[in-house]
Amino acid sequence: MLKRDMNIADYDADLFAAIQEETVRQEEHIELIASENYTSPRVMEAQGSQLTNKYAEGYPGKRYYGGCEFVDKVETLAINRACELFGAEYANVQPHSGSQANNAVYMALLNAGDTVLGMSLAHGGHLTHGSPVNFSGKLYNIIPYGIDEAGQIDYEEMEALAIEHKPKMIIGGFSAYSQICDWARMREIADKVGAYFFVDMAHVAGLIAAGVYPNPVPHAHVVTTTTHKTLAGPRGGLILSNEGEDLYKKLNSAVFPGGQGGPLMHVIAGKAVAFKEALEPEFKEYQVRVVANAKAMVAEFLARGYNIVSGSTENHLFLVDLIDKDITGKEADAALGSANITVNKNSVPNDPRSPFVTSGIRVGSPSITRRGFSEEDAKNLAGWMCDILDNMGDESVIEATKAKVLEICKRLPVYA
């Protein structure tokens, strides 16, 4: 018989120790990976609920199993809140991840071999936008577009490529681009060649929900996102659209039964909580601070003589180009990690090094802002990072910086 006082600590000491170690790491490290965030205890409560036991293939009111009347309520709450949050008529909250949401869009709108215009991974795109190692690059004819010498999306190139190649779908969105996307211009280009316009807003969904970054939903045929990152919910995916019932039916079928079986009802409950949190005024205030902190960090890096791809940031992330410093992204990642500052190595435009080494790092502000960093804190943090990068291999600098990191982490805990 199952008892509610069963716990991991008493039963599986090895697993419990690993979980505790990760808990300590999160509290004692500064998290700057742009795709990570801290979700609320309310979201974690939902994910640890008995909803995890329920199979619910299908959609609310149209399930293949009985006993779904209450999980129908949960999913309907998530759907309605997602639509309200982003101004959408349709939402599918079942994708297990952003990549699976993207896969569903491909399946719904395209046939294998169709031509797709997507942002080059080397210029800030995502694996699912056409990388040859991903399903998108293996199954479809991908034409990449990129950024110009000023670090802005080259819309003239995009339009010329669209006219030349006549893609069936054009993808907007990114994983490492720090500027504002002109969704209206992209839709104009798509309409000019009769293509679907699909936006993956995973990185900026929280900013969009708060109104501090342009919303693609009014412009795109279909929009996807993750529900973590800037949105700060559970790890999962979401599909949105305003383009009519025919498209909604295709998207639903592409998710289930096309790509997934039963939805993760405990995660959908977590999404419902996160969407409610994102509708609160405090969430907008948080997102405003996210952008302000990223800008404060960029200003300090520039003042210290570092190159920033695109020269600035208008969202939550930026890329530090280390080519002229003769430091690899891999080396910078490791050095900063030694001081309890977590970033990720990242390719920069025209990077001469492999994706496993790279010549840059990607820096994001959602997590530090979530734990209460001010603009002054963010500026100081960028300075500490420059200290380490200016003195690669100097253990005294690393140790001094680590002490500062531990002090601010103690002052600003993730979970107070």
From Swiss-Prot:
Catalyzes the reversible interconversion of serine and glycine with tetrahydrofolate (THF) serving as the one-carbon carrier. This reaction serves as the major source of one-carbon groups required for the biosynthesis of purines, thymidylate, methionine, and other important biomolecules. Also exhibits THF-independent aldolase activity toward beta-hydroxyamino acids, producing glycine and aldehydes, via a retro-aldol mechanism. Belongs to the SHMT family. One of its GO terms (biological process) is tetrahydrofolate interconversion. The modification N6-(pyridoxal phosphate)lysine is found at K229. It comes from Aliivibrio salmonicida (strain LFI1238). CDD domains: SHMT. The keyword Repeat does not apply. This is Serine hydroxymethyltransferase. Its cofactor is pyridoxal 5'-phosphate. Homodimer. InterPro entries: PyrdxlP-dep_Trfase (IPR015424), PyrdxlP-dep_Trfase_major (IPR015421), PyrdxlP-dep_Trfase_small (IPR015422), Ser_HO-MeTrfase (IPR001085), Ser_HO-MeTrfase-like (IPR049943), Ser_HO-MeTrfase_PLP_BS (IPR019798), SHMT-like_dom (IPR039429). Its main location: cytoplasm. One of its GO terms (cellular component) is cytosol. Pathway: One-carbon metabolism; tetrahydrofolate interconversion; Amino-acid biosynthesis; glycine biosynthesis; glycine from L-serine: step 1/1. GO terms for molecular function: glycine hydroxymethyltransferase activity; pyridoxal phosphate binding. (6S)-5,6,7,8-tetrahydrofolate binds at L121, G125, H126, L127, E245, S354, P355, F356. Keywords: Amino-acid biosynthesis, Cytoplasm, One-carbon metabolism, Pyridoxal phosphate, Transferase. Pfam families: SHMT (PF00464). It is found in: Cytoplasm. The keyword Nucleotide-binding does not apply. It comes from the Bacteria. Its EC number is 2.1.2.1.
